[in-house]
């Protein structure tokens, strides 16, 4: 039965493209009263990747939750991708994951399929050096899976998205194009080589990238997921009080993604991201499929790291030596200008 199941056919939208758009989400969150505590080091105020709560002078808890609908048809791969995506928030904060809880919404008729999803998630968490400690399930006709992840970090070594500094160099650790490729997968229009490459990109942990950036020392970091490169860069720029400038020609793309974008296989999340970022992003170059892919919602995307120019060469060299998909210098941090983001 497992071989006959195509998980993506159960869903309306795939992966992080299924997120509520940033514009709608902002309208909800702005009405919430933000409660604060001196030990809550990172909360709702900066749209960061995870919450951080200080327990004592040496330990802070980093906590996040992330789950979504299937992005691929193979249940084991889906489990691995969902786990890698959830763990990424902890890595972006410079923390070490300790344990995770499964979050499951699944049709009861496909328990054998669910077993494979959970096996994939468990294997990826094990690869991260963490543990699955339990979870929660809901019966649902549209499958969803992910994790609630808890990690730790020294309170003075938290890497936030709100501390980028003018003069910093921006380095991205995975190529873009996942949202477009996932749309092609769901429509059964994705070439097999592009499909297989995208699966490998999504399954790849940001663990080594996080370890290297901690050793080198960086100013800020965020992971690139549902709001796309430009959406998450906007959160970094706005929270840091700076402007970010991207070089369009330096943007890395998964092989085959550009061609799929040219075919018009653009996910709805891309258009939601564009709408939200209107007036915040200034495109100074021809708007083509590369620009679409900069708005494209990613699933288990890479880290966007803001590092001082003095340390950028070392970080770039070490990341490229270690990471499976390399690292790419994609832009710079500038003093605050009229727009939060420029693409040149």
Curated annotation (Swiss-Prot):
Primary enzyme class: transferase
Record's catalysed reaction(s): hydrogenselenide + ATP + H2O = selenophosphate + AMP + phosphate + 2 H(+)
Organism: Caldanaerobacter subterraneus subsp. tengcongensis (strain DSM 15242 / JCM 11007 / NBRC 100824 / MB4)
Lineage of the species this protein comes from: Bacteria, Bacillati, Bacillota, Clostridia, Thermoanaerobacterales
Keyword Transferase tagged: yes
Family of this protein: Belongs to the selenophosphate synthase 1 family. Class I subfamily.
EC numbers on record: 2.7.9.3
Pfam families linked: AIRS, AIRS_C
Keywords assigned: ATP-binding, Kinase, Magnesium, Metal-binding, Nucleotide-binding, Selenium, Selenocysteine, Transferase
HAMAP family: SelD
Protein's job: Synthesizes selenophosphate from selenide and ATP.
GO cellular component entries: cytoplasm
SUPFAM superfamilies named among the record's database cross-references: PurM C-terminal domain-like, PurM N-terminal domain-like
Quaternary structure note: Homodimer.
Binding, ATP: 19, 46-48, 66, 89, 135-137
GO terms classed as biological process: selenocysteine biosynthetic process
Keyword Iron included in the entry's annotation: no
Protein name: Selenide, water dikinase
């Amino acid at each position: 039965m497992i071989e006959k199941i195509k998980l993506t056919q159960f869903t309306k939208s795939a992966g992080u493209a299924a997120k509520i758009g940033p514009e709608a989400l902002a309208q909800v969150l702005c009405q919430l009263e933000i409660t604060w505590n001196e030990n809550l080091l990172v909360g709702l105020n900066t749209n960061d990747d995870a919450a951080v709560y200080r327990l004592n002078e040496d330990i802070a808890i980093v906590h996040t939750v992330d789950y979504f609908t299937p992005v691929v048809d193979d249940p084991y791969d889906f489990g691995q991708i969902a786990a890698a995506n959830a763990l990424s928030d902890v890595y972006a904060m410079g923390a070490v994951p300790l344990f995770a809880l499964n979050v499951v919404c699944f049709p009861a008729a496909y328990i054998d399929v669910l077993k494979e999803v959970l096996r994939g998630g468990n294997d990826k968490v094990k690869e991260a050096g963490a543990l699955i400690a339990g979870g929660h399930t809901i019966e649902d006709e549209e499958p969803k899976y992910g994790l609630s992840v808890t990690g730790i970090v020294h309170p003075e070594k938290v890497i936030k998205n709100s501390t980028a500094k003018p003069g910093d160099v921006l380095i991205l650790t995975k190529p873009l194009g996942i949202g477009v490729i996932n749309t092609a997968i769901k429509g059964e229009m994705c070439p097999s080589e592009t499909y297989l490459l995208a699966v490998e990109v999504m399954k790849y942990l940001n663990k080594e990238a996080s370890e290297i950036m901690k050793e080198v020392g960086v100013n800020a970091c965020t992971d690139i997921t549902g709001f796309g490169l430009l959406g998450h860069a906007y959160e970094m720029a706005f929270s840091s009080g700076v402007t970010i400038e991207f070089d369009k020609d330096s943007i890395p793309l998964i092989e085959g993604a550009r061609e799929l974008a040219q075919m018009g296989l653009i996910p709805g999340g891309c258009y939601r991201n564009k709408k939200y970022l209107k007036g915040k992003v200034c495109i100074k170059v021809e708007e083509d499929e590369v620009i679409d892919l900069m708005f494209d919602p990613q699933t288990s995307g890479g880290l966007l790291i803001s590092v001082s120019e003095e340390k950028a060469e070392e970080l770039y060299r070490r990341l490229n030596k270690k990471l499976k998909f390399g690292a790419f210098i994609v832009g710079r941090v500038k003093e605050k200008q009229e727009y939060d983001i420029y693409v040149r």
